[in-house]
């Protein structure tokens, strides 16, 4: 997007936007978290294309970026699978053609229609948008590898997504338990019952049909319909939702296992989901890490540390009393908080660099927020994760690393304004370079 910014007024500038659409399509096949870069991209576009910048305009740009994410995530991705399923049923169950004929025909028709529309419509905005949609679709077809691999019947073929219907289930991650986001059940919620004759049954909402191929008849058959259980005692912003983890929630809130209050719900959100499952990982990278043993809240495993003894001992107890295996752990890295301080200075310096600096800050902030805290809100994680989840927030750490670089430039700029001595500026630059040197020497053994 920065290359587009440099060439946005040229004849070929829009090619960078089309390339971005293609990369987003490819990223769908890697991980959906890549879509969270869209708000930062849209803000760069807004700042470049509009001379008059206003808070209302920024809010509109952010809203449009949110709509783009919603379109790709909840309309485009499942919609392509749905339409492919309709074609598959028509061609196989009605026309009697072989399996996958409908899906292949749908993809061919999609590309034909998009190519025809690109040739027919020449207005710049519409033409570029159609190219973006085509490239998004081309990137999305990387999921064909999943179908091909599943049909090869490899030894490891979990959930066997060998047709469009099982592929849709795979894309929707239906093998995992879904977590409520804004409103829903808690771990103490009971199923809702409704009368049925002389008995009561659990109230459910009927979902879509589940199809499976019958290879003997050469057709798809409905084996069941999806059902969602309706619960009573729902709450807003439910964070403590999994009945399997009722006792684990108590460890983080100190509450009871009967029914969580909203206070306990928010306590869990702050102490576990925010502090333990995000800020702890953030501080690992920019302050220091105790060891690489997965922790569950205990003071000796997987915490962040500074390397400043009195401060670490105050938080976690006397670190010198830890067993030798933990003190000599290769994941023990101390940065003394220097990268964090330099990054915070970078934020301060960027924000105070007039109007342009504030615009740049907003782009980086939304990249930082959307690839960090927004993921925390969306995942709604339960205690006892099978592994550390720091990898999920790599984009957020990348954004803060940019602020560290800006902080180094800001320090040099600030000193240059106060002195003309090249020696002093050189000394400061050397000090700034010592920070990544310290990080490299500390983390080399964990990554060797």
PLM segments and residue spans:
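Membrane-interface transmembrane helices that cradle and orient dolichyl/undecaprenyl
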Residues: 1-16, 45-54
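Membrane-interfacial entry segments at the cytosolic side of transmembrane helices
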Residues: 12-15, 51-63, 94-104, 119-134, ...
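Membrane-interface alpha helices of multi-pass inner-membrane proteins
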Residues: 17-29
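Transmembrane-embedded, aromatic-rich helix segments that form part
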Residues: 33-45, 105-110, 408
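Hydrophobic, aromatic-rich transmembrane alpha-helices
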Residues: 109-119, 336-356, 410
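Transmembrane alpha-helical segments
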Residues: 137-147, 424-448
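Lumenal/periplasmic acceptor-binding loop at the mouth of the active site in multi-pass
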Residues: 150-347
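Hydrophobic/aromatic-rich transmembrane helices and adjacent perimembrane loops
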Residues: 385-410
């Amino acid at each position: 997007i920065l290359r587009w910014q440099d060439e946005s007024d040229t004849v070929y500038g829009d090619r960078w936007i089309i390339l971005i659409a293609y990369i987003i399509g490819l990223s769908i096949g890697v991980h959906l978290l890549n879509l969270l870069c869209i708000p930062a991209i849209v803000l760069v576009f807004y700042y470049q294309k509009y001379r008059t910048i206003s808070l209302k305009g920024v809010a509109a740009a952010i809203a449009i970026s949110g709509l783009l994410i919603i379109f790709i995530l909840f309309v485009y991705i499942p919609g392509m699978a749905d339409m492919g399923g309709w074609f598959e049923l028509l061609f196989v169950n009605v026309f009697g053609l072989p399996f996958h004929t409908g899906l292949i025909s749908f993809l061919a028709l999609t590309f034909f229609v998009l190519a025809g529309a690109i040739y027919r419509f020449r207005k710049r905005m519409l033409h570029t948008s159609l190219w973006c949609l085509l490239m998004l679709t081309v990137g999305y077809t990387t999921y064909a590898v999943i179908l091909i691999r599943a049909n090869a019947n490899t030894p490891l073929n979990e959930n066997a997504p060998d047709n469009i219907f099982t592929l849709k289930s795979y894309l929707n991650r239906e093998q995992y338990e879904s977590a409520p986001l804004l409103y829903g059940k808690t771990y103490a919620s009971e199923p809702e019952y409704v009368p049925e004759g002389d008995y009561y049954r659990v109230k459910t909402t009927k979902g879509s049909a589940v199809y499976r191929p019958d290879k003997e008849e050469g057709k798809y058959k409905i084996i069941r319909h999806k059902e969602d259980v309706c619960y009573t005692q729902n709450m807003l912003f439910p964070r403590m939702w999994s009945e399997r983890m009722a006792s684990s929630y108590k460890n983080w809130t100190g509450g009871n296992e009967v029914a969580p209050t909203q206070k306990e719900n928010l306590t869990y959100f702050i102490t576990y989901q925010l502090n333990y499952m995000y800020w702890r990982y953030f501080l690992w990278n920019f302050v220091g890490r105790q060891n690489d043993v997965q922790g569950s809240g205990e003071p000796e495993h997987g915490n962040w540390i500074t390397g400043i003894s009195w401060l670490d001992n105050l938080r976690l107890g006397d670190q010198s009393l830890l067993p030798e295996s933990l003190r000599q752990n290769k994941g023990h890295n101390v940065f003394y908080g220097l990268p964090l301080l330099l990054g915070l200075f970078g934020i301060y310096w960027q924000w105070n660099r007039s109007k342009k600096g504030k615009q740049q800050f907003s782009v980086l902030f939304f990249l930082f927020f959307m690839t960090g805290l927004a993921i925390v809100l969306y995942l709604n994680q339960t205690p006892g994760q099978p592994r550390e989840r720091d990898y999920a927030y790599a984009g957020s750490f990348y954004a803060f690393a940019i602020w560290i670089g800006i902080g180094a430039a800001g320090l040099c700029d600030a000193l240059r304004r106060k002195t003309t001595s090249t020696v002093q500026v050189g000394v400061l630059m050397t000090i700034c370079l010592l920070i990544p040197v310290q990080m490299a020497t500390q983390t080399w053994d964990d990554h060797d």
